[in-house]
């Protein structure tokens, strides 16, 4: 009969520690395993695919238990972190063999989604940002950090719109918030399955202030203090590598909201969710992990300062002109490891011997990189060469101290080079001489006993011993051999001489290992003192890496240097190409297009059949702008561009069902973002606005939006539409120009030219698109007959309402032109159906329904 057991001292200790971390999985170290208990064990066994067992199985209340081996713990932690959980690592704080009573245990680190510094394969070029948000009367103080690299930045945001843009740009998984947070703010911040972590009012940190003297805004200082208090409380170790907070303004960069980033496939492909076939993947010829991260930042935050853009362009041009020097630079960069994260591991105390060798190898490349900079022409490179600190003292220290091929463990010896420390060398000599003595003893015992198979062995349990097979036991001399252990086929013995020598050897080995670890810690501390120098060098190398990447891609893809101008918003792109589509199709297969929008053109109204390339044309301009303002060369024959402050997009259909929003609601929300926030210096891309609702509603909204943008916003706008009636707006809107994607019919077949031409499209090609999709010939013939009948019966097509006189007030988006009444409901339905906007399946379903109604009659 099971018996109820009282709480054991160990479970009492576990429960006391668990109570301090109720929202985390507690990994409780017992020997070589981390154990999970109770609810943690039940949930952990499911998530981690562990065997669920129990402690005290015979009791009425057995305790659920599951465990993971200590050497593989990180992989299990990563799984829980990926699911959005926190993990508290509880270690044994003393040697169990020497402990009196219960072994002391304590949580040494709380790993969270925003603080995980273990970088998985394939993620080296990505940041893991943790953010902090502190609402105040005028907006939101906002800070973010990457614990693995030491980056720390802060700003003050004036609106929820600005806050959402920053959160999406950083792709943060965890947000630190104060205790007092409204439900409205909490709901907004949790979008995208972000984890909210509450940090009570923070006292100044014991490590010193992370707030620089230049940071004078009290709200910004407070949010930095809150974030750093959380990091220090969770990491429970030195964060000396985290730099003082740098203030920034999002408005100092080209701003893009979440929709623009997604629609343009800048960092992530919107269709696959992966990084392939994106602007980032195309431009990434970086050789270092830190260069890859900086490239993402440059693409995510293109510049507004025309002088800063020019500096980058000059550097790219110089590298482009010096092929051999660029090749030498690339060769050296491939041997540079992740200096930022190596510095972080040094500060964390998790650096090992192999990490230090990687650091030394990286630093050894710097003199050669400086030589390359000296051969380039641009003055900024020569200035960089003189400022670049090779940190040669750290490289020299590691070269003198650390074995070239050290073990992973830092506690088992074998790390420190001979000659670095005399005392360590003497211990090693003692061990070497003693082992020689052991070998000589083995030879003499074999000779004395006549047992040729006699061996002197060692293991951690019994130490040194003499092993003799049972067939030779009769040859053992009496009185001198003391039996130690009996095996199936052998006996193990010790002798007084062997026991004495064992003590000397083990003492020397233990002293050697302890001294070696102390020496390694001292070396680590010396490197830690130079972290700021290493971080400065990392920033310089990262920038060089991105610049050479831009130059390499420009050369391979035949990009040109764009001309940037301020003061006007004129666009002159000739022979422009969509960089990613061109890469996929091949340059010879891609058809380039011009985008000409001077002072008398604010809007291009784009018409043409589906699948003809309207969306590609629109995205092409936006990507060229982003590349140019990031400092890259661009895919065009000529590119003369203004400086844009924001990009807004509405491209493609997408529901947000998780938030209860239909395609049309998403469409209107995205349109409203541009209408509310765009300026005359912005770029707007609207694709098929109004298609998510009924025809007349959609056309009315599209026309009203066009008029509002034209009359009130004055931003450069590319607006594609399937409402051909809207093309007549060019008669009343002076700065609207019609363009269309060319297509020709050859022998009854439609051929897309993928070329943008002036003027509106002269007809719809919906039936031809349906033919390309492979719909049945009879169905297509019937659709063609219906179309001709419609065109004959309804010669007076619905025209757009006259454009109103421009007034300095917001236009109503919900006043639509009244539809012309029809005699037949079926004809009314036909008149409203736009074949060009329909997919082949839409057309087939429509014709099927139409036939059903006619047959009933």
From Swiss-Prot:
GO BP annotations listed: mismatch repair
CDD domains recorded: ABC_MutS1 (cd03284)
HAMAP family: MutS (MF_00096)
PANTHER family: DNA MISMATCH REPAIR PROTEIN MSH1, MITOCHONDRIAL, DNA MISMATCH REPAIR PROTEIN MUTS FAMILY MEMBER
UniProt key word DNA damage: yes
Annotated binding of ATP, by residue: 608-615
Top-level taxon of the source organism: Bacteria
GO cellular component terms, semicolon-separated: cytosol
A Pfam family matched in the record: MutS_I
The keyword DNA-binding appears for this protein: yes
Gene (name only): mutS
Entry protein name: DNA mismatch repair protein MutS
Database matches in InterPro entries: DNA_mismatch_repair_MutS, DNA_mismatch_repair_MutS-lik_N, DNA_mismatch_repair_MutS/MSH, DNA_mismatch_repair_MutS_C, DNA_mismatch_repair_MutS_clamp, DNA_mismatch_repair_MutS_core, DNA_mismatch_repair_MutS_N, DNA_mismatch_repair_MutS_sf
Molecular-function GO term, any one: damaged DNA binding
SUPFAM superfamilies, alphabetized: DNA repair protein MutS, domain I (SSF55271), DNA repair protein MutS, domain II (SSF53150), DNA repair protein MutS, domain III (SSF48334), P-loop containing nucleoside triphosphate hydrolases (SSF52540)
Gene3D superfamilies recorded: 1.10.1420.10, DNA repair protein MutS, domain I, MutS, connector domain, P-loop containing nucleotide triphosphate hydrolases
Family per similarity comment: Belongs to the DNA mismatch repair MutS family.
Function: This protein is involved in the repair of mismatches in DNA. It is possible that it carries out the mismatch recognition step. This protein has a weak ATPase activity.
Coiled coil stretches, renumbered: none
């Amino acid at each position: 009969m099971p018996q109820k057991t009282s709480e054991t001292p160990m479970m009492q200790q576990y429960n006391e520690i668990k109570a301090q971390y109720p929202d985390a999985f507690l990994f409780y170290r017992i020997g070589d395993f981390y154990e999970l208990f109770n609810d943690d064990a039940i949930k952990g066994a499911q998530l981690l695919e562990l065997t669920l067992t129990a402690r005290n199985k015979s009791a009425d209340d057995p305790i659920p238990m599951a465990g993971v081996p200590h050497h593989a713990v990180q992989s299990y932690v990563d799984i829980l972190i990926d699911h959005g959980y926190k993990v508290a690592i509880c270690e044994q704080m003393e040697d169990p063999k020497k402990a009196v009573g219960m072994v002391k245990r304590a949580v040494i680190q709380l790993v969270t989604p925003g603080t995980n510094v273990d970088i998985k394969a394939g993620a080296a070029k990505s940041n893991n940002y943790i953010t902090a948000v502190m609402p105040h009367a005028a907006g939101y103080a906002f800070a973010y950090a990457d614990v693995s690299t030491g980056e720390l930045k802060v700003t003050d945001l004036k609106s929820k719109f600005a806050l959402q843009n920053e959160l999406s740009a950083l792709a943060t998984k965890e947000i630190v918030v104060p205790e007092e947070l409204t439900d409205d703010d909490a709901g907004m911040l949790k979008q995208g399955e972000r984890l909210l972590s509450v940090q009570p009012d923070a006292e100044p940190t014991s490590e010193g202030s992370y707030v620089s003297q230049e940071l004078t805004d009290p709200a910004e200082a407070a949010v930095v203090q809150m974030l750093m208090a959380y990091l220090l409380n969770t990491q429970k170790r030195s964060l000396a590598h985290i730099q003082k907070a740098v203030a920034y303004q999002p408005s100092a960069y080209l701003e893009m909201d979440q929709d623009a980033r997604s629609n343009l496939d800048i960092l992530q492909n919107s269709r696959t969710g992966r990084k392939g076939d994106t602007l980032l993947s195309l431009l990434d010829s970086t050789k270092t992990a830190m260069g890859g991260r900086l490239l993402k930042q440059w693409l995510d935050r293109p510049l507004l300062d025309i002088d800063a853009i020019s500096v980058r362009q000059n550097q790219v041009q110089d590298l482009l002109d010096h092929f051999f020097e660029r090749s030498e630079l690339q060769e050296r960069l491939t041997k540079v490891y992740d200096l930022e994260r190596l510095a972080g591991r040094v500060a964390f105390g998790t650096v090992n011997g192999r990490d230090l060798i990687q650091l030394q190898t990286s630093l050894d490349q710097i003199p050669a990189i400086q030589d390359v900079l000296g051969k380039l022409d641009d003055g900024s490179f020569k200035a960089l060469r003189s400022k670049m600190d090779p940190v040669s003292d750290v490289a020299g220290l590691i070269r003198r101290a650390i074995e070239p091929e050290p073990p992973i463990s830092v506690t088992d010896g074998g790390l420190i080079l001979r000659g670095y420390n005399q005392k360590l060398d003497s211990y090693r000599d003692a061990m070497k001489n003693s082992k020689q003595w052991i070998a000589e003893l083995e030879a003499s015992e074999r000779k004395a006993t006549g047992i040729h198979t006699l061996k002197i062995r060692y293991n951690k349990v019994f130490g040194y011993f003499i092993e003799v097979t049972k067939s030779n036991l009769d040859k053992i001399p009496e009185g001198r051999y003391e039996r130690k252990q009996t095996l199936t086929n052998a006996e193990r013995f010790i002798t007084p001489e062997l026991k004495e020598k064992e003590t000397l050897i083990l003492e020397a080995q233990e002293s050697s290992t302890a001294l070696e670890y102390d020496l390694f810690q001292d070396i680590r501390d010396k490197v830690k003192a130079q972290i700021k120098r290493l971080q400065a060098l990392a920033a310089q190398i990262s920038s060089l890496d991105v610049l050479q990447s831009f130059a390499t891609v420009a050369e391979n893809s035949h990009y040109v240097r764009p001309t940037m101008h301020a003061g006007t918003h004129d666009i002159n792109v000739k022979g422009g190409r969509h960089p990613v589509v061109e890469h996929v199709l091949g340059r010879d297969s891609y058809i380039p297009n011009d985008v000409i929008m001077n002072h008398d053109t604010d809007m291009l109204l784009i018409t043409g059949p589906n699948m003809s390339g309207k969306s590609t044309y629109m995205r092409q301009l936006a990507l060229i702008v982003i590349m140019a303002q990031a400092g890259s060369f661009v895919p065009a024959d000529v590119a003369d561009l203004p400086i844009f402050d924001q990009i807004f997009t509405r491209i493609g259909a997408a529901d947000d069902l998780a938030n209860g929003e239909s395609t049309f609601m998403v469409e209107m929300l995205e349109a409203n973002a541009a209408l509310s926030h765009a300026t005359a210096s912005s770029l707007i891309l609207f694709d098929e606005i109004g298609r998510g609702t009924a025809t007349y509603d959609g056309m009315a909204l599209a026309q009203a939006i066009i008029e509002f943008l034209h009359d009130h916003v004055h931003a450069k706008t590319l607006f594609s539409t399937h409402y051909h009636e809207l093309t007549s707006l060019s008669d009343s809107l002076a700065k609207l120009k019609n363009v269309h994607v060319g297509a020709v019919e050859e022998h009854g077949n439609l051929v897309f030219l993928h070329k943008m031409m002036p003027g509106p499209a002269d007809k719809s090609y919906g039936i031809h698109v349906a033919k390309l999709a492979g719909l049945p010939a009879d169905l297509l013939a019937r659709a063609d007959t219906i179309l001709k009948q419609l065109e004959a019966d309804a010669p007076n097509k619905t025209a757009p309402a006259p454009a109103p006189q421009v007034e300095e007030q917001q236009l109503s988006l919900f006043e639509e032109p009244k539809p012309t009444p029809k005699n037949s409901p079926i004809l009314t339905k036909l008149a409203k159906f736009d074949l060009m906007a329909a997919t082949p399946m839409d057309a087939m379903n429509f014709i099927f329904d139409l036939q059903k109604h006619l047959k009933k009659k």
